[in-house]
Amino acid sequence: MAVFKTLTDADMAIFSTGLVAGVDEVGRGPLVGDVVTAAVILDPNRPIAGLNDSKKLTEKRREALFDEICEKALSFHVGRASPAEIDELNILHATMLAMQRAVAGLSLTPELVLVDGNRSPAFNHAGQALTSHSIVKGDGLIASISAASIIAKVTRDREMDALDAAYPQYGFAKHKGYPTKAHFDAIAEHGVFDQYRKSFKPVKALLER
């Protein structure tokens, strides 16, 4: 498969038999909240049917798979970067930091890390440098990355639901913090609070009025 062109023979051997962590993120585009990432090491002896890119799954299916991943995975961990860190570092570097935190938090040391997308940060676990590769559209190709995308997506969606309960006037349960017309209208009427990413242009423009 073309997806494996970047993997060496040694990496392929690890992919087939070793501890492989899949990593993905959610929440780079929203105006509010953390960017959330997850790292997952699946158990090859306990396969999970139906794993796919979280965006291609219904909410009900994501929730069911979330529970199954939590039960069956050898290890998983959620990493995040806060709005303040996003504002300080920029969204790309904050996302890389969140991914590093997700991998560092695993209870097992992976032999290989596969990251969705076209770039990967340097990973360390318990003081050990790890081999990693980025896989374009990996969340639809690699089971462990699919699992990570589901863990990250469900985690962040639940956080947006909690934010919606605290600030119902913003409609977070519907738009999940993304820059929709309804969200812009709510910001124009009610302003922003500390969970907003103040470096993002729409928020910055409002604050500079």
Curated annotation (Swiss-Prot):
It comes from the Bacteria. Gene3D superfamilies: Ribonuclease H-like superfamily/Ribonuclease H. CDD domains: RNase_HII_bacteria_HII_like. The keyword Manganese applies. Residues 18-209 form the RNase H type-2 domain. Its main location: cytoplasm. Endonuclease that specifically degrades the RNA of RNA-DNA hybrids. Belongs to the RNase HII family. This is Ribonuclease HII. The gene is rnhB.
